[in-house]
Regions:
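Conserved "HGTGT" condensation-loop signature of ketosynthase/thiolase-family condensing enzymes
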Residues: 1-132
Length: 132
């Protein structure tokens, strides 16, 4: 995440939305949360987070591309997509994950999309609004 932001010429303070990879597994989700906490600090609790894989299922190698499309649309429409089927939040992961779409406001947008694949393939893209 740090490398993606650095390559984008951005800082953690500019991020307005996170599309988490969110595997919905106890090990995977807590690991991603700890990574987010390490990068964003306590500010991560104020950033709207989506987990769009819940809407599509796991598409193996295609998952990251589709999650990036969700993130592009979130930035374009200034609206973080909902995390569907979320009925019970993990108390160990106190993120701002919504079951409803979350408005992102009128300010320039910068979102990241995490994709953590099988075998340790990890990628993150930073997507900035055109008005930035």
């Amino acid at each position: 995440m740090r490398a993606a932001l650095e390559q984008a010429g951005a800082t953690v303070d500019e991020v307005t939305h996170i599309n988490a990879h969110a595997t919905s597994t106890p090990v995977g989700d807590i690991a991603e949360y700890k990574a987010l906490l390490a990068v964003f600090g306590e500010r991560v609790h104020d950033i709207p987070v989506s987990a769009t894989k819940a809407a599509t299922g796991h598409l193996l190698g295609g998952t990251g591309a589709l999650e990036a499309i969700f993130t592009i649309l979130a930035v374009k429409n200034r609206l973080a997509p909902p995390t569907i089927n979320l009925t019970e939040k993990d108390p160990e992961i106190p993120l701002s994950v919504g079951g409803e779409a979350q408005p992102l406001g009128d300010a320039p947008q910068l979102a990241i999309s995490n994709s953590f694949g099988f075998g340790g393939h990890n990628s993150v893209v930073a997507i900035r609004s055109y008005d930035s």
